[in-house]
Amino acid sequence: MSLSPAIPLRVRDADIASTIGAELVSAEGVGLTLGGRQILVNVDVAVHAGEIVTLIGPNGAGKTSLARLLLGLVKPTAGKVTRASDLRVGYVPQRFPVDATIPIDVRRFLTLGVRVSLPAIRSVLQEVSALHLMDRPIAVLSGGEFQRVCLARALVGMPKLLVLDEPAQALDYAGEMQLYELIGDIRKRRGCGILLISHDLHVVLGASDRVLCINGHVCCEGIPEKVASHPEYARLFGREAGKAVAVYRHRHDHEHDLSGAVKCGDDCGHSHD
């Protein structure tokens, strides 16, 4: 992996900067070496309450490793990580293996390892539009349904920071749009910070306040439109990739149903082609 110097891009949207809250977690100059291989070099990142930060980059770029450093699951070999003293974290990993032979329903899944009241279970399932799944076996859920249930589990502990590793990997395009709208709604309701990890460029950039492009180091960072036009981004993903940011950047005055179809009438003011 080539570790060329990062090209700084620290542009902050004024509206975003005015609404974010206290710093929840930060990394300063962190590096990580595993088995003699450099995974991360001199990375700076911070996540504040009320903002959505996305780590993007190719497979093997160190995105998940950086998230694990921020969560304290591994220790950096250089630099330091600082977490708020009262930080509560909700984490949805990239893979959450569940043995299909074990008869466990959604209600039981949400209580594994934690004590949760039935009203709390109902509340988080309602929040992610999955209350109707409460008594359904985990083994029969679709990919999108299971992602919502995993998100509900992460919300049970009232986290101040929500970390989602490739949350849309099992979803089609319509499902991705629904999920990222839901994530945005959670941020607005709860005021929590959200760290997203993805290598998918089509929707996740438009759902983010700030983006860091990672390839062992921070190639570039800033608001989505600035990152998408950055030469380091184009070098990693191709010059056509920047057009993906515009796909879902506008604010909707319509809703989608569970199939992804638009629920508003013809006068909603948007093109849905």
Name what the model sees in each region.
Residues 229, 236-273:
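ABC ATPase nucleotide-binding domains
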Residues 162-166:
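Catalytic Walker B motif of ABC-type/P-loop ATPase nucleotide-binding domains
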Residues 211-223:
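H-loop (His-switch) and adjacent beta-strand-loop-beta switch element
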Residues 118-134:
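Conserved ABC ATPase "signature" region
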Residues 198-199:
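H-loop/switch region of ABC-family ATPase nucleotide-binding domains
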Residues 158:
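Conserved catalytic motifs of ABC-family nucleotide-binding domains
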Residues 137-141, 145:
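Conserved ABC ATPase signature
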